[in-house]
C-alpha cells in the first residue's frame, strides 16, 4: 500500500486469496474477489515472493461475473474457483509465454492448459485470450498462441463465437444476458 500512497493513490484495499471487497457501481455494489493463481511476485531484484499474486472475480450487481486470471500457470485451483464462483460470463486467460515447458510451466500456462482452465471454471461464456504477442518473453513464435488456442478450443467443440483472441488494439463488446445459475460463492 505504501507504493500507491507515495504516488497519491489512497483508496487501496489489500486482499488475500478468497477475501473480497465491494466496488460501488451505478447499479449497486459489485463484489471483487481475490483468488488464487500460480505464479510468483517480484517487485525488485532482491525482493522475491514477498507479495501475494492473485487472480480476480468481479461479480456485478446483476449477477453476471467476469474472471481475470492475471499471470498464472495452470493449477488445480481453477476447478476450486469454478466450484465456488463459476461459471463465468467471461474469462480472461493467458495463452502465451509458455516455451520451454520445463522452465515456464510453473509460471505460465500453454494454450491447451488455458482451455482446460476455462473448462475447470465452468466452461461457459466468453474466453478472452490474453498475455501473448506483446513482448517476446519465451521461445514460442509470438503468433503461435492464437493458433494453438483455436485448435484446443475446436477439439472441445466449444462455440467459435465464444473464443475471443483480439488483435492488438482491437475492442469488442458483448451484451451480457441474464446470468447462468451460479455456484453459491464463498
Predicted features and spans:
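A short helix-to-beta-strand connector/capping loop
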Residues: 8-11, 28-30, 158-162
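Core dinuclear metal-dependent hydrolase active-site scaffold
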Residues: 15-86, 151, 167-186
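Cap/insert and terminal regions of metallo-dependent hydrolase folds
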Residues: 2-3, 65, 73-167
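A short acidic, glycine/proline-enriched capping/turn motif at secondary-structure boundaries
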Residues: 1-2, 39
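Helix-loop-beta element that forms the nucleotide-linked donor phosphate-binding surface
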Residues: 3-16
Amino acid at each position: 500500500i505504501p507504493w500507491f500512497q507515495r504516488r497519491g493513490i489512497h483508496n487501496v484495499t489489500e486482499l488475500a486469496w478468497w477475501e473480497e471487497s465491494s466496488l460501488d457501481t451505478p447499479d449497486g455494489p459489485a463484489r471483487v474477489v481475490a483468488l488464487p493463481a500460480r505464479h510468483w511476485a517480484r517487485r525488485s531484484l532482491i525482493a522475491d515472493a514477498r507479495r501475494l499474486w492473485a487472480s480476480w472475480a468481479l461479480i456485478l450487481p446483476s449477477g453476471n461475473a467476469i474472471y481475470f486470471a492475471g499471470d498464472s500457470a495452470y493449477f488445480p485451483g481453477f476447478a476450486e474457483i469454478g466450484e465456488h464462483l463459476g461459471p463465468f460470463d467471461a474469462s480472461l486467460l493467458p495463452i502465451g509465454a509458455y516455451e520451454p515447458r520445463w522452465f515456464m510451466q510453473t509460471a505460465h500456462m500453454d494454450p491447451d492448459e488455458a482451455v482446460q482452465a476455462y473448462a475447470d471454471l465452468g466452461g461457459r461464456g466468453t474466453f478472452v485470450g490474453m498475455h501473448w504477442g506483446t513482448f517476446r518473453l519465451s521461445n514460442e513464435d509470438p503468433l503461435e498462441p492464437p493458433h494453438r488456442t483455436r485448435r484446443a478450443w475446436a477439439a472441445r467443440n466449444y462455440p467459435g463465437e465464444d473464443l475471443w483472441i483480439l488483435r492488438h488494439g482491437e475492442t469488442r463488446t458483448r451484451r451480457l444476458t441474464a446470468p447462468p445459475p451460479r455456484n453459491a460463492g464463498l
